[in-house]
Regions:
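Short beta-strand-to-loop acidic/aromatic patch adjacent to the donor-nucleotide binding site
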Residues: 1-10
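Conserved nucleotide-sugar donor-binding catalytic segment
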Residues: 41, 45-127
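Catalytic core of nucleotide-sugar-dependent glycosyltransferases
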Residues: 116-121, 128-153
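Membrane-interface aromatic/basic loop that binds lipid-linked glycans or pyrophosphate carriers
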Residues: 169-210
Length: 210
C-alpha cells in the first residue's frame, strides 16, 4: 500500500491499524484501487462526512457536493500502472493528472473516518497554487487537456477547461500550431481563446501578489 502524506500532514493514532483492517476488504477486488478517508483540518471549525457510499471514484465523490479534504491510500500495483509524465524543464505535475486516470478504471473503498490531521501552512502547496501555474505550465496544460477529455460535457465546462488549457500554453510559450494540434478540440479551442486570455491575466495577477 501507498499512503499519500504531505509535509504538513500528521498521521492520527490508530491510522495504520485502520488501514490494515480496511485493506482486507479491498485486496482481492480488482476494481478497487485503494481507500479514501477524511482528513482533519486543524484550523477549520467544521469537517464534512464523506458520501454514504461503499465505494466511489475520487471525482464522483466531489460531484456529490462534498468539499472537504481526503486521505488517500493506494494499492502500490495500481500506482505503477499510471506513472507521472516526464516534462523537459519542469519538475512538477499535479497529482490530479494521475488520479483522474485512475478514476477511469478503478474506485476507492470509502472509510468515513479520519486518517490524518493537517494545519495548512502559508508557504504550502495549496496556498501557493497560483505560483505553481507559472512555474510548471506545461504540466498544468497536460492536466487541463486530459480533464477536458474526461469530464467536460456541457459547452460551458468545455470553454472553461479549454480556457485553462490555453492559458497554461500561453505561460509555457507553446507555439499556436502545437497548442491547437495537442488540443482535445480545435473548434472549442478557437471559441475558448477569450476565456484563455482571461485566465492568463488572472493567474499572472494572483502570482504577482504572492
Amino acid at each position: 500500500l501507498f499512503f499519500c502524506i504531505d509535509s504538513d500532514d500528521q498521521i492520527i493514532e490508530g491510522t495504520v491499524k485502520k488501514i490494515i483492517e480496511t485493506h482486507q476488504g479491498l485486496q482481492d477486488d480488482k476494481f478497487l484501487c485503494g481507500i479514501i478517508a477524511k482528513k482533519l483540518i486543524i484550523n477549520r471549525q467544521t469537517s464534512q462526512n464523506l458520501p454514504n457510499l461503499k465505494r466511489s471514484t475520487l471525482h464522483d465523490i466531489y460531484q456529490t457536493g462534498f468539499t472537504g479534504d481526503t486521505s488517500l491510500v493506494f494499492k502500490t500495483s495500481v500506482l505503477r500502472e499510471f506513472p507521472f509524465p516526464e516534462i523537459a524543464g519542469e519538475k512538477f505535475v499535479t497529482e490530479g493528472y494521475v488520479y483522474d486516470q485512475i478514476d477511469q478504471k478503478y474506485e476507492f473503498l470509502i472509510l468515513n473516518d479520519f486518517l490524518m490531521r493537517c494545519e495548512y501552512q502559508e508557504d504550502g502547496y495549496t496556498t501557493n497554487a497560483a505560483s505553481l501555474y507559472l512555474k510548471y505550465p506545461k504540466g498544468w496544460a497536460l492536466f487541463y487537456a486530459q480533464y477536458y477529455r474526461f469530464y467536460a460535457k456541457s459547452l460551458r465546462d468545455k470553454i472553461k477547461y479549454m480556457g485553462h488549457y490555453i492559458s497554461m500554453c500561453m505561460f509555457a510559450k507553446i507555439p499556436l500550431f502545437k497548442m491547437f494540434n495537442d488540443s482535445p478540440s480545435v473548434i472549442i479551442s478557437l471559441i475558448s481563446i477569450p476565456a484563455g486570455l482571461k485566465f492568463y491575466k488572472r493567474f499572472k495577477s494572483n502570482a504577482s501578489t504572492k
